[in-house]
Design a protein with these regions (language model features):
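Short, glycine-/small-residue-rich phosphate/pyrophosphate-handling segment
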Residues: 126-149, 234-250
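Short, flexible loop segments at boundaries between secondary-structure elements
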Residues: 165-170, 219-239
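Short, well-structured alpha-helical segments in soluble
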Residues: 63-79, 178-192
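Short, acidic/small-residue loops that bind anionic groups at enzyme active sites
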Residues: 101-124, 211-230
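Periplasmic-binding protein-like
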Residues: 81-87, 133-135, 192-199
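Glycine/small-residue-rich loop that forms an oxyanion/phosphate-binding "nest" at active or ligand-binding sites
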Residues: 71-114
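Hydrophobic alpha-helical
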Residues: 180-211, 226-227
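N-terminal glycine-rich anion-binding loop in soluble enzyme alpha/beta folds
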Residues: 2-71, 138-175
């Protein structure tokens, strides 16, 4: 005989902060790196995926606009979020930060929406950064669009370099050692305030401390600034002190 047992309902998982993250279908890195930061038991992090192209072009990036509300709508309907992050740097430069926020809010309940571009601008303001060295994996057209958006936000792209890789599956597998070598060549003898590693598919967390020590300047990445900005908007602080000066000091 089956017994009907009593139960009680508690609060939503994550007593202090509730985060949502929209990850590109082609992204293999963002969730892996976020798991290293959003690991406090008092926080919850829910993820959704948005359809994206295998190749990074202005056209494939623009197409994501059509699917963002649907991706946000795949979060639990009853959940209320402090912050939802959209995980695409170049996509933000093409679609626009305000448009992204509007589309995400149509699909879920959240107090704040952010993405790597707004997060980078906020991080640079917090750190007093104006002159950026910019390392990109993208083809020229995509990189130029993003650089123009950053210049319009008051940042000076002092020096720029790119791997010029169009396939997302290859971007996700660029080795950290390749990034260290490229960063050192790019920043050498340049008068910059910080280095920015652009793209949520780049593996950046493991090399931030090493690069800051060798370059003697702050090192920011798409995943790093997005994580920091999401925590900041929620009124939270990171517990990590081994991922660069942004998380450690701000």
């Amino acid at each position: 005989m089956e017994q009907k047992l009593s139960f009680e309902l508690g609060a939503q998982v994550g007593a202090d902060a509730h985060f949502g993250l929209i990850v590109l279908q082609s992204d293999q890195t963002l969730e892996y790196e976020f798991a290293q930061v959003f690991s406090k038991p008092e926080w919850s992090l829910h993820t959704s995926r948005v359809k994206s192209g295998d190749e990074v072009t202005v056209e494939t990036l623009a197409e994501m606009e059509n699917d963002l509300t649907g991706a946000a709508g795949l979060f639990p309907k009853s959940a209320r979020y402090d912050v939802v992050g959209y995980g695409c740097t170049s996509g933000t430069s093409v679609i626009g930060a305000k448009r992204i926020a509007d589309l995400v809010r149509l699909g879920c309940h959240t107090t704040h929406v952010t993405e790597p571009v707004s997060a980078l601008v906020a991080a640079c303001k917090a750190m007093g950064v104006k002159r950026l060295a910019f390392l990109s994996p993208y083809i020229g057209e995509v990189s130029q669009t993003l650089r123009q958006v950053l210049v319009e936000q008051g940042l000076d792209i002092t020096v720029f370099g790119s791997f010029q890789e169009q396939l997302e599956e290859n971007v996700a597998r660029i080795t950290p050692s390749s990034m260290v070598s490229a960063s050192q060549k790019l920043v050498s003898k340049q008068n910059v305030d910080a280095l920015f590693l652009s793209c949520t598919n780049l593996q950046s967390f493991s090399i931030v401390e090493e690069l800051e020590q060798s370059l003697q300047c702050p090192v920011l990445s798409s995943n790093l600034v997005l994580a920091w900005h999401m925590m900041t908007l929620a009124g939270m602080c990171s517990h990590r002190t081994d991922m660069g000066s942004l998380l450690r000091e701000h």
